[in-house]
Amino acid sequence: MASTFSQSVFARSLYEDSAENKVDSSKNTEANFPITLPKVLPTDPKASSLHKPQEQQPNIIPSKEEDKKPVINSMKLPSIPAPGTDNINESHIPRGYWKHPAVDKIAKRLHDQAPSDRTWSRMVSNLFAFISIQFLNRYLPNTTAVKVVSWILQALLLFNLLESVWQFVRPQPTFDDLQLTPLQRKLMGLPEGGSTSGKHLTPPRYRPNFSPSRKAENVKSPVRSTTWA
């Protein structure tokens, strides 16, 4: 009886309807309740590090002074004073003034050659005296003694007058006799040129006469040798 019922057309239709209902119910459940499976992460450590969230670091903007000066830990690098600075005192620093030996010579020559107020007065007085003697010769007796004295006075006055005029006419000195370098002449305001040699104005006090070609045994000792009898 059971076998005939299961093999009947009605039983088969019921079985097929139940199977279709099960398939439809499974589709409805999947549509209503979707199931998301977890994605498999890659096994590469580099790729896994990319998926990790990066920690936010504080944005520190250094100042201009910090950029120029390196950060040095004072505990690791203690400050060391310069050698000998503690013993130096400003009061013991030698201070002085040095002047080139040729400065005095240059100043004296320029003073003697430059015309001054005395030169003007000397020139005017000699000129006035020379004109006065020429005027007095007309009233003096025409004797030999008077003529000789007049000529001597006129010669002296004329010499003084020409010497005064020469100070205004003569060229400027070049100081070629002084041993100066071109830089020294420029600093002193002298004209360029002139003979310069390698000699010193003040030669050194000691000049060693030792030649490196000599041997040690051939060099004589400065101490006087003594002989014993």
Swiss-Prot record:
Checking Pfam families in the record gives: NPCC (PF08058)
Q: Indicate yes or no for the key word Endoplasmic reticulum.
A: yes
Q: What GO terms describe the biological role, i.e. biological process, of this protein?
A: meiotic cell cycle; nucleocytoplasmic transport
What does the UniProt keyword field contain?
Answer: Endoplasmic reticulum, Meiosis
Localization, UniProt? Endoplasmic reticulum
The region called Disordered is annotated at 16-68, 189-229
An example of a Gene Ontology cellular component annotation for this protein is: perinuclear endoplasmic reticulum membrane
Q: Summarize the protein's role.
A: Has a role in meiosis.
Q: What is this protein called?
A: Meiotically up-regulated gene 31 protein
Give the lineage. Answer: Eukaryota, Fungi, Dikarya, Ascomycota, Taphrinomycotina
* Gene that this polypeptide is encoded by: mug31
